[in-house]
């Protein structure tokens, strides 16, 4: 992805968040120049835990078809050291018909919450013993109600609804066509993008950046490229 595209995507997402009165911490708005002027040491938790902006096309070249924009608000270390939080939180902009590809987590348990906008479609499968798709029924909890669905079921989450996904449940999600973009929340155990994502089809979790203009905001995996 090019910084020009990322800049535009983040501008759109900030406007989308503002529609729902979503407020982010001050560092969400720091420019690269501001980051470069700061003492790095007090901000080490942000860098180590990849807090902040994330724009990904999952290695694809069509962000509108496959991609996600999110901001990680809080996180902890796998194993609890050096950062003892046992939980994580994200706020996400899931665009209409924009797919987050099928994946599961070995360790993370998460609630995916439709905070507003359109409907969120979530497709579900269990993982089999070889990390492929199982044909077994999938058991999940929707807002405290335990439900079992056939493999490959697509559940529709309207604004206010949520789903709890346990480890080893494959899931893919997107904004339902005809209903607009979706404001999605995620509350989970510790998030470890480097070691706890299993995508059904191998892909890049973070997009490679091809320089064409300066970034207006830094992505969570780019801080150390810009900060001495």
Swiss-Prot record:
Pfam family for this entry, one: Lyx_isomer
Gene name of this polypeptide: lyxi
Keywords for the protein's UniProt record, in alphabetical order: Carbohydrate metabolism, Isomerase, Manganese, Metal-binding
Cofactor annotation: Mn(2+)
Record-stated family: Belongs to the D-lyxose ketol-isomerase family.
Temperature note: Optimum temperature is 40 degrees Celsius.
Binding site for Mn(2+): 103, 105, 110, 171
GO MF term list: D-lyxose ketol-isomerase activity; mannose isomerase activity; metal ion binding
Binding partners and assembly: Homodimer.
Organism: Serratia proteamaculans
Annotated catalysed reactions: D-lyxose = D-xylulose; D-mannose = D-fructose
EC number in record: 5.3.1.15, 5.3.1.7
pH dependence of function: Optimum pH is 7.5.
Function: Sugar isomerase that catalyzes the reversible isomerization of D-lyxose to D-xylulose, and D-mannose to D-fructose. Shows optimum activity using D-lyxose as substrate, but can also effectively catalyze the isomerization between D-fructose and D-mannose. Shows lower activity with L-gulose, D-talose and L-ribose.
Protein name as annotated: D-lyxose/D-mannose isomerase
Statement: the UniProt record of this protein carries the keyword Manganese: yes
């Amino acid at each position: 992805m090019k910084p020009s595209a990322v800049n535009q995507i983040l501008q759109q997402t900030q406007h989308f968040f503002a529609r729902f009165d979503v407020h982010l911490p001050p560092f969400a708005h720091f420019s690269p120049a501001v980051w470069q002027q700061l003492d790095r040491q007090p901000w080490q938790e942000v860098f180590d835990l990849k807090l902040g902006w994330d724009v990904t096309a999952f290695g694809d070249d069509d962000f509108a078809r496959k991609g996600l924009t999110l901001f990680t608000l809080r996180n902890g270390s796998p194993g609890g050291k050096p950062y003892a939080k046992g939980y994580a939180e994200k706020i996400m902009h899931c665009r209409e018909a924009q797919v987050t590809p099928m994946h599961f987590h070995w360790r993370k348990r998460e609630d995916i919450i439709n905070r507003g906008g359109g409907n969120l479609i979530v497709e579900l499968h269990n993982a089999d013993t070889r990390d492929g798709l199982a044909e077994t029924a999938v058991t999940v909890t929707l807002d405290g109600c335990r439900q079992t669905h056939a493999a490959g079921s697509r559940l529709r989450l309207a604004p206010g609804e949520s789903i709890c996904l346990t480890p080893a449940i494959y899931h893919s999600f997107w904004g339902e066509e005809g209903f607009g973009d979706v404001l999605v929340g995620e509350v989970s155990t510790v998030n470890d993008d480097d070691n706890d994502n299993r995508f059904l089809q191998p892909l890049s979790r973070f997009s490679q950046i091809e320089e064409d203009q300066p970034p207006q905001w830094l992505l969570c995996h780019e801080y150390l490229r810009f900060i001495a």
